[in-house]
């Protein structure tokens, strides 16, 4: 397959290099990733500034393209300008840190995959449950297998897969769970400081997790050492509320 590989940790991140090496022997892989880290930018796109693309070499060899934009920008520019015909599949990751629960909406990694789904391209986002992972073997074993299955079975229009992998060696993974997006979220705290000129500013710090207790959710499957695979889509409509709103005499 022709695969577009992107991420939100940036083109020089360990995770994207790991996925590239895991996929390159079996697939034609094109890397288009942000030049700088774009964690938690969500589905933002660049509107008021130009986008610049530059070649990137790693370990003395051409690796891919760095873009001065967001993960969603990377997918858009790759499909519109850098890959012809469009890719057969878009893979976003490996993200450092899980993307589960409500935090999915903040994720640039997941947003790259949902952007591809909006464009009608099968896609998946891949994250590992650590900001400093020590072993990618579970990722490099599972993702190529999942790609083969998706290529065979297909995905419904507008749907992508959100994959979260425990920070464990492959032989310690308990299995794979198909899950729903949970309600786990971060409870943010801000550190209030004062600069030398007396102006107040804030650092986001000391975030705590409100975890799910439903075994069908992505976060709990991950916490129990299972790989979590969640089908997600960009349609945010709450369909059950449509009839109710219609009775409000708006």
Curated annotation (Swiss-Prot):
Can you list the GO cellular component terms from the UniProt entry? cytoplasm
Cofactor note from UniProt?
Binds 1 divalent metal cation per subunit.
Record keywords, A-Z: Cytoplasm, Hydrolase, Metal-binding, Nucleotide-binding
Record has Acetylation as a keyword = no
Q: Could you tell me the EC number(s) of this protein?
A: 3.1.3.5
Where does the record place it?
A: Cytoplasm
Cofactor(s) the protein needs: a divalent metal cation
- Which of this chain's residues are annotated to bind a divalent metal cation? 8-9, 39, 95
Broad enzyme group: hydrolase
- Which InterPro entries does the record associate with it? SurE, SurE-like_Pase/nucleotidase, SurE-like_sf
State one molecular function term (GO): 5'-nucleotidase activity
Reactions catalysed, as given in the entry: a ribonucleoside 5'-phosphate + H2O = a ribonucleoside + phosphate
Q: Which family does it belong to?
A: Belongs to the SurE nucleotidase family.
Q: What HAMAP family does this protein map onto?
A: SurE
What task does this protein carry out?
Nucleotidase that shows phosphatase activity on nucleoside 5'-monophosphates.
- The protein in question is named 5'-nucleotidase SurE
Q: Which organism is it from?
A: Syntrophobacter fumaroxidans (strain DSM 10017 / MPOB)
């Amino acid at each position: 397959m022709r695969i577009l590989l992107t991420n939100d940790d940036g083109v020089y991140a360990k995770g994207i290099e790991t996925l590239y090496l895991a996929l390159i022997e079996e697939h034609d892989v094109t890397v288009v990733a942000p030049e700088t880290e774009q964690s938690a930018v969500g589905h933002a796109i660049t509107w008021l500034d130009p986008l610049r693309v530059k070649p990137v070499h790693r370990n003395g060899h051409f690796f891919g393209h760095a873009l001065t934009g967001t993960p969603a920008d990377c997918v858009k520019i790759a499909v519109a300008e850098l890959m012809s015909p469009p890719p057969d599949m878009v893979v976003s990751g490996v993200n450092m840190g899980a993307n589960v629960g409500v935090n999915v909406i903040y994720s640039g990694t997941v947003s790259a995959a949902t952007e591809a789904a909006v464009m009608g391209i099968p896609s998946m986002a891949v994250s590992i449950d650590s900001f400093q992972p020590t072993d990618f073997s579970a990722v490099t074993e599972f993702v190529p297998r999942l790609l083969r299955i998706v290529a065979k079975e297909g995905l419904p229009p507008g749907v992508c897969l959100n994959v979260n992998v425990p920070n464990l060696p492959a032989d310690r993974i308990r299995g794979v769970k198909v899950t729903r997006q949970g309600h786990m979220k971060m409870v943010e705290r801000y550190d209030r400081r004062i600069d030398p000129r007396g102006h107040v500013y804030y650092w986001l710090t000391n975030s705590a997790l409100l975890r799910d207790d439903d075994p069908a959710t992505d976060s709990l499957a991950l916490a129990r050492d299972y790989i979590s695979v969640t089908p997600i889509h960009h349609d945010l409509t709450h369909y059950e509320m449509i009839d109710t709103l219609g009775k409000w005499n708006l």
